[in-house]
Amino acid sequence: MARAVGIDLGTTNSVVAVLEGGDPVVVANSEGSRTTPSVVAFARNGEVLVGQPAKNQAVTNVDRTIRSVKRHVGTDWNIEIDDKKYTPQEISARVLMKLKRDAESYLGEDITDAVITVPAYFNDAQRQATKEAGQIAGLNVLRIVNEPTAAALAYGLDKGEKEQTILVFDLGGGTFDVSLLEIGDGVVEVRATSGDNHLGGDDWDDRIVTWLVDKFKGSSGIDLTKDKMAMQRLREAAEKAKIELSSSQSTSINLPYITVDADKNPLFLDEQLTRAEFQRITQDLLDRTRQPFQQVIKDAGISVSDIDHVVLVGGSTRMPAVTDLVKELTGGKEPNKGVNPDEVVAVGAALQAGVLKGEVKDVLLLDVTPLSLGIETKGGVMTKLIERNTTIPTKRSETFTTADDNQPSVQIQVYQGEREIASHNKLLGSFELTGIPPAPRGVPQIEVTFDIDANGIVHVTAKDKGTGKENTIKIQEGSGLSKEEIDRMIKDAEAHAEEDRKRREEADVRNQAESLVYQTEKFVAEQRGAASDGGGSKVPEETLAKVDSAIADAKKALEGTDISAIKSAMEKLGVESQALGQAIYEATQAEQPAGGSDNGAPGDDNVVDAEVVDDDAGKENK
């Protein structure tokens, strides 16, 4: 049976893990790292770079490098490169394709099944878009799992049968979640979840960037925000400074040649940022995590003292101010240090993949829907059918009626959120139920059913009880992609995968050819050098000329893009090189009798096996 992987598709970094002998293993990528930057770049030569290579060239290719696309998932955002528009799903799919490739390389087999994690507070459109990204990448998405739930699964599975309450505080690169879970006897149950989809480490980086821009403007009068390349360098320096301030009290930010003044003189940026100053300029961001924490405690109906363990997830939780705040909020409870905040979510996803594949037994994962779901009723009111923090999968029905006499149809508008007025919430989609027989208002019976599957994706049905007519919608308008568009993107991704394979093959062939040309040229030059030194070449000039011709053909082929021509030229050069080697060997053999006759009897040409010993050392040993 083919194995399934667990993928943490993060804002700044992504991780893939797989079960090996029942234990989760984080897979290192082709660059040797266990985390892959969620960065995609379109090089000007047509190559698509993903991960660290994409991040490395960001400064010189700002407009064609995309990062933190997770913040746009589930929206109508797109980016145009070379007259082609790319959606967040397509960019995310590039990252997933790399993770898939790296996992396949590690396992030595094809991977099609995956469990992908999302922030607990992701709405339906964002979940649907994440699933579509998986499909575009050629993955069969077995399940969409909430990140804190996956983390709790990874943390709590081996904690015995005693029931425990775990708080997961998840601050990633672009999103924040806090969840309360109960674990015991193989059951992982989410009690409550809350969060902010637009709060993460990127926001802390942005504050440092703003601070640096203001400092530089104050000293030089130049506004760096107008220089894209300078801003990219500032972002990279800000991320590095943030990381350094987690272990140091201050850090030096030094960027030579950041820009030039009016007289074209180069200017340097050199600033010292202390941890205290960093915490001051980001205090309001930290404070935004308090309300979701308090909401979760309230929704779960427990007190802070009931929490047994605190698990920190996401690289941003390494900031000392975050750790201190969590300790303060939990009444001094020390966060668990036994999990890697960057990897624990992928590990949990791999375990859930194992559960779905039957590799992990006796584990039940009970997740919740993070936001209430309902429809708009008379007066623009949001009538909730499913309350937030309801365990999923779930199904709820409610009967409604018409607002006007002889109303022939009803418009069902589906919303997600907590506001009392429907329009203040997120509109997921709408559809119409037609063919209602003429009747006074209040008489027709319209049954509306909400069905949320285990991925947290919503299906809504409206049925006229009188006629039996019904209409169903699978909410996907929020993602903005039709089945045809997804199919097109899948084909596009497959085509690019083939392009990438060809490009890698082309690079390998080109490198081999260049290496062969260099080595052969060097060898021919040595032979001619020996002849000019008076020793005489052991090879006829005619043979060397043939090699020269083959080298020239190979060089000419390398100037073009025809790989078959390069291969053909390389084969020809290989044949001539072998002929050259054979000629040298034969010439050397021919010289042997003459060279050996000075040394005595013909019988002396027996070969003796012996070690070479240094003469002086030999004398000392005698």
Curated annotation (Swiss-Prot):
InterPro entries: ATPase_NBD, Chaperone_DnaK, Heat_shock_70_CS, HSP70_C_sf, HSP70_peptide-bd_sf, Hsp_70_fam
CDD domains the record matches: ASKHA_NBD_HSP70_DnaK-like
Biased composition (Acidic residues): 606-615
Gene Ontology biological process terms in this record: protein localization to plasma membrane
GO molecular function, one term: ATP-dependent protein folding chaperone
Reported induction: By stress conditions e.g. heat shock.
Region (Disordered): 584-622
Source domain of life: Bacteria
Residues where Phosphothreonine is found: T175
Pfam families: HSP70
Keyword Phosphoprotein annotated: yes
Keywords: ATP-binding, Chaperone, Nucleotide-binding, Phosphoprotein, Stress response
Family stated for the protein in its record: Belongs to the heat shock protein 70 family.
Record PANTHER family: HEAT SHOCK PROTEIN 70KDA
HAMAP family: DnaK
Function noted in UniProt: Acts as a chaperone.
Protein name listed in UniProt: Chaperone protein DnaK
Organism: Mycolicibacterium smegmatis (strain ATCC 700084 / mc(2)155)
